[in-house]
Amino acid sequence: MSLLQFSGLFVVWLLCTLFIATLTWFEFRRVRFNFNVFFSLLFLLTFFFGFPLTSVLVFRFDVGVAPPEILLQALLSAGCFYAVYYVTYKTRLRKRVADAPRRPLFTMNRVETNLTWVILMGIALVSVGIFFMHNGFLLFRLNSYSQIFSSEVSGVALKRFFYFFIPAMLVVYFLRQDSKAWLFFLVSTVAFGLLTYMIVGGTRANIIIAFAIFLFIGIIRGWISLWMLAAAGVLGIVGMFWLALKRYGMNVSGDEAFYTFLYLTRDTFSPWENLALLLQNYDNIDFQGLAPIVRDFYVFIPSWLWPGRPSMVLNSANYFTWEVLNNHSGLAISPTLIGSLVVMGGALFIPLGAIVVGLIIKWFDWLYELGNRETNRYKAAILHSFCFGAIFNMIVLAREGLDSFVSRVVFFIVVFGACLMIAKLLYWLFESAGLIHKRTKSSLWTQVEG
């Protein structure tokens, strides 16, 4: 890449970054937080944060990258995607009418809410316990990270339930919403994330998500300023780099350490070059249609229920890894959101996907605002826990693609909804058995007097 070509790419990158950052800043000033702000920051991180890192790798370490015209296509496709997404998100689908009283879809009380977070936490802890009994601490047993996907590891499906510890702790926080509950959320979820990091053998998702939710709650409540958020972001990048070194068993120093930091940070936070690789091989792609979305559900179907279930699921990430890159190392390489759309339907699917994503984020913000307006604090805690708990799925959306997001968000909704239903059923059984006694002001006053 020549300096002239780099200069042209830099101008496009700068314009796209300023465009998205400016719209995000105005939205932040207006509402301080919503899921449009979160997705916009996530989109910036995924598709634009990596460009400076790639530039240093090219000019400092002479690393090979896709041709400049392909990198330009990747930057422009990301910028156009966001423009269509933003217009869709801001388009009002129906006229605003005065809020009329409606019959609520569901209600929550204190006992049901506490039962819900206990069940969610129980699912996570029991899953971790069973996985540990089968495999021990994989971080200290396996020689390479790719081995966690091999047949040596049993009970892999249990990992999908680990994440429900975070929504459980979110319910606990939203019931109190003070600084102590906020700090307790951080300590408990990060400790759990470190535990799963050691047990699973290097998976950092729970730590990243817990830390991100902690920061956004701090921003919403005014406990964290923007400069503190920036400092925490730098600390998070360094922390994720250190965990990556431990995961891959690397011991580096000097220029090698700087080089390793650049490419691991780029691959962890901003795999935008994967989109460029996909566009470089555009003519070799056999468009998959909506099949990757259907196939991604296969991993949630137990083999005893479907004996003939394919052992290898050809979703967009695996198609990109196996068919496009001819990589059979055992690790799936993230195609990114835009890349998954290209795999499914080519360039035509990029604006269509942007419209779909705009509607998805609009729905989450509607649910979040519903929680903000809710007068029943127990129901509000459940709604907010669901919304913030889905942050993991939004990260999957930006990094892995639309197909992975759809299957995971459906799984999340089913499990979360099942926990709600079980909590309500248990409450009904306890109440029928006479074990539930409603609190009254007089009884509470008597306890205080005594």
Curated annotation (Swiss-Prot):
Q: Which residues cross the membrane?
A: 6-26, 37-57, 63-83, 118-138, 155-175, 181-201, 207-227, 228-248, 341-361, 378-398, 410-430
Q: Which UniProt keywords apply?
A: Cell inner membrane, Cell membrane, Membrane, Transmembrane, Transmembrane helix
Q: Pfam families, per this entry?
A: WzyE
Q: Report which superkingdom the organism of origin falls in.
A: Bacteria
GO cellular component annotations of the record: plasma membrane
- BP GO terms, sorted: enterobacterial common antigen biosynthetic process
Identify the metabolic or biological route this protein is part of. Answer: Bacterial outer membrane biogenesis; enterobacterial common antigen biosynthesis
Which cell locations does it reside in?
Cell inner membrane
Assembly description: Probably part of a complex composed of WzxE, WzyE and WzzE.
What NCBIfam families does the entry give? PRK02975.1
Q: Which family does it belong to?
A: Belongs to the WzyE family.
State the function annotated in the UniProt record. Answer: Probably involved in the polymerization of enterobacterial common antigen (ECA) trisaccharide repeat units.
> What name does UniProt use for this protein?
Probable ECA polymerase
> Taxonomic lineage per UniProt?
Bacteria, Pseudomonadati, Pseudomonadota, Gammaproteobacteria, Enterobacterales
